[in-house]
Amino acid sequence: MPSLVGSEMCIRDSFSTDVTVARSVLAEQLGAAMVMVMPPYHGATIRVPEAQIYEYFARLSDAINIPIMIQDAPVSGTPLSVPFLARMAQEIKNVAYFKIETAGAASKLRELIRVGGDAIEGPWDGEEAITLMPDLDAGATGAMTGGAYPDGIRKIVDAYAAGKRDEAAAHYEKWLPLINYENRQGGILTAKALMKAGGVIASEAGRHPFPAMHPAVREGLLDTAKRLDPMVLRWGK
């Protein structure tokens, strides 16, 4: 499996099966090595039953030749049980990767691996790595974290993969304050704020109408980051 960096992974989803398929086909044509897709949902209340979710992913799989990662995240408001996820992995050709971001992620990852067996090629952690160590202990083989400090996250994952759990835990404890700031305070603006501070980008503004980061949060974020000296703060200078 190619490394999933930058444009090699494409996030595609829509409430429309046809739109999701079209976007994913285009993503593959443009060089994506994988697509990550949530179950279909619209607004706060419109959801579909498991049968339609299954068909949604089955049709997508039939249209492309690259793996599908199902993102299991609370924002979709769609409960995805372990037996259902495992069944899709076992029966739908390209469904093989899972980004688990629900409460109790480690327990769900562990059970998904047990129930799904070899069909679960990529059980992944998410949510900015706030639960990375428990998720790795549960069997996660990868993580989709915030994009601002991969040098810090890599130290954790590399040490764990090398069988050096104590070293991985030490790195995790060191970087956890910054991970926490992103997950609980700065949110999706964290990477932009750090990149702006490091001279990588000119503006840290999110898409309107997303509110700007509060100055006090930004100050705390940068203070926390400077203690760790991530590459992002030096990259553009």
Show the residue positions of the predicted features.
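Glycine-rich, proline-tolerant flexible connector loops at the mouths of alpha/beta enzymes
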Residues: 15-17, 37-52
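Catalytic cores of alpha/beta
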Residues: 17-26, 130-138
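Alpha/beta enzyme core
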Residues: 21-35, 53-63, 81-96
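Catalytic alpha/beta core domains of metabolic enzymes, predominantly
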Residues: 59, 73-185
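C-terminal alpha-helical cap/extension of soluble enzyme domains
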Residues: 136-140, 148-237
